[in-house]
Amino acid sequence: MTNNQFSEDTKKIADQIKDALMGISDDLVLESKEVEEIFEELSQNEEFEYEMERMLSILNEQTMDLTQLQSRIILLIRKYLGKTKNLKLKMLKMDEKLINKNVAEVSNYLMHQHSKIVRDANKNLTNPKDKLQGLTKQARIDLKRLLKSFAVYQIYMFMNPKRIAGETKLMNFAYNMIKGGMKLAKKYEGGKEQEIKSYSPRLIKKLKKAHVGFKKSGGISI
């Protein structure tokens, strides 16, 4: 499988998770269409793309300086918010205390996914040099996607600070549900019976549909 195909597949799953999370609640501060417009604006921002490339230098092949990474992403988001053309986003009041709390929670999710990527990249490699090469060529693309995903989530967090607290579990549940169905999702964080009952039927339906699509596409690990 080429790096291009790997990158496209991981992006597809990331988009499926994002789409599924849109169905969590009907009381979003911003409507789904507006959220999509902001995501689109971000993806076309060349300066943002350049800054994300610079952030990759914070990562070495096997470890992550989370504090430094976190600080840079927050600074980038603040900088981006100051330049956005979206008037509704400009008018939102930020709950700094709650945002700081949520940053820590989302960071735990980031580290969890980073560990998965490193572990998968190291699979079946025994020579340390091979591991380093594997991470550089295979995992670096996915780490970049992960960083972008985290940064986009920060923007979403600024838009919806009061709704983020429980969503790291939802993100983990969505990831596992799409990748391995309900059976896999129940084994990890966010998959307890009571937690599943608290999720909207619409979300569960979207995740099941995404899982079927994932299997049909040949389902690779992300």
From Swiss-Prot:
Residues 43-73 form a coiled coil. It comes from the Bacteria. Keywords: Coiled coil. InterPro entries: Uncharacterised_RC0039 (IPR020171). Pfam families: DUF5394. This is Uncharacterized protein RC0039. It comes from Rickettsia conorii (strain ATCC VR-613 / Malish 7).
